[in-house]
A protein has these predicted regions:
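N-terminal Rossmann-like or analogous alpha/beta NTP/dinucleotide-binding catalytic cores
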Residues: 1-90, 179-180, 184
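Active-site cores that bind ATP or allylic diphosphates and position pyrophosphate for catalysis
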Residues: 79-185
Length: 185
């Protein structure tokens, strides 16, 4: 509702995007129900983007660009290993990735027996932006969350890679999210 009000009051274009990357949790009937509910509430949209589950080629191309620029690397850590390595956790319960696989050599990577997830190398500097509701938000990603996964070990692309790829392709300039997602914006 807030996204719709924000867009309509500014004369913008409302985009509906179905974020259905996770094949285990997302189903076509959920997306259909979501649309039906929005219509029932009187919330319309101007553009319906292709569902993320059908945009794998776009995410693969974005990932390949990051790989070409050496901005991603394979990570072989299990969740259990990460829980143990990052204790104590951040105050919000988020795991802070300690960089375990960031500097592995080619020989060390070749010796691994697990399929890797892929992490984005975050900059070692502070970033800031002005959120329309929360004001100026500043974070140091390397300290506050560490390098984050952009492709899971099963090959599914992460939300963070998908949404920026989709926003760029769709010319999206304003994003309305819950404050719980502010740190991943």
């Amino acid at each position: 509702l807030l996204a719709w009000l924000s867009v309509r009051s500014a004369g913008g274009e409302m985009v509906l995007r179905i974020e259905d990357l996770d094949p285990d949790r997302c189903r076509a009937e959920y997306a259909a129900q979501l649309k039906e509910d929005l219509i029932w509430l009187g919330l319309d949209w101007d553009v319906e983007q292709t569902p993320q589950s059908l945009r794998t080629a776009a995410y693969h191309a974005a990932f390949a660009q990051l790989e070409e620029r050496e901005m991603v690397y394979p990570c072989y850590c299990s969740r259990g290993e990460l829980h143990a390595a990052s204790a104590p956790h951040a105050s919000d319960g988020q795991l802070i990735y300690p960089g375990t696989c960031r500097g592995l050599t080619a020989a060390q990577r070749a010796a691994q027996t697990r399929r890797p997830a892929w992490r984005l190398r975050v900059p070692e500097e502070e970033i800031s932006f002005c959120d329309g509701l929360q004001g100026v938000y500043t974070e140091r990603l390397d300290r506050d969350c560490g390098d984050f996964i952009i492709r899971r070990s099963d090959g599914v692309y992460a939300y963070q890679l998908a949404v920026v790829t989709d926003d760029g392709a769709g010319g999206v300039t304003q994003i309305v999210r819950g404050c719980d997602l502010l740190s991943s914006t």
